[in-house]
Amino acid sequence: MEDSKIIDLYWERNEKAISATEQKYGSYCYYIAYNILHDQEDAEESVNDTYLGAWNAIPPHRPNMLRTFLGKITRSISLKKWRDAHRDKRGGDEVSLVLDSQSYHL
């Protein structure tokens, strides 16, 4: 299916837009997500989140190049997921305090 027809389906809020997107760009989006996340399950989740992101963005946005539009959404979602996973490994949102000898004396 042509990109313009897929975009029209999104614009009409037709759920066939998601299946058409998956059929045409699913492997492309998965490739992007997997190369960032290196985990099959996380990559699949990012791709599904990409479809939701496209659904929420079209309308009002009507992308000129659907492939690029989806790639940017996938990349953004995957990078956020990667950062969240690695932040947790570093201690999450905890702030560690380093006390030197000067700050110890109050």
Descriptions of predicted regions:
Residues E2-I6:
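Acidic, Ser/Thr- and Pro/Gly-rich low-complexity regulatory segments
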Residues W11-A20, Y30-D49:
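Short, charged helix-capping/linker segments at alpha-helix termini
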Residues W11-E12, H38, N48-L66, D84-H86:
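Sigma70-family region 2
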Residues A20, D42-S46, M65, F69, ...:
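Alpha-helix N-cap and coil->helix boundary residues
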Residues T21, Y25, C29, T50, ...:
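Residue-level preference for hydrophobic side chains embedded in well-ordered alpha helices
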Residues R75-D93:
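Arg/Lys-rich amphipathic alpha helix in sigma70-family domain 2
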Residues R90, L97-L106:
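Acidic, proline/glycine-rich intrinsically disordered inter-domain spacer in sigma factors
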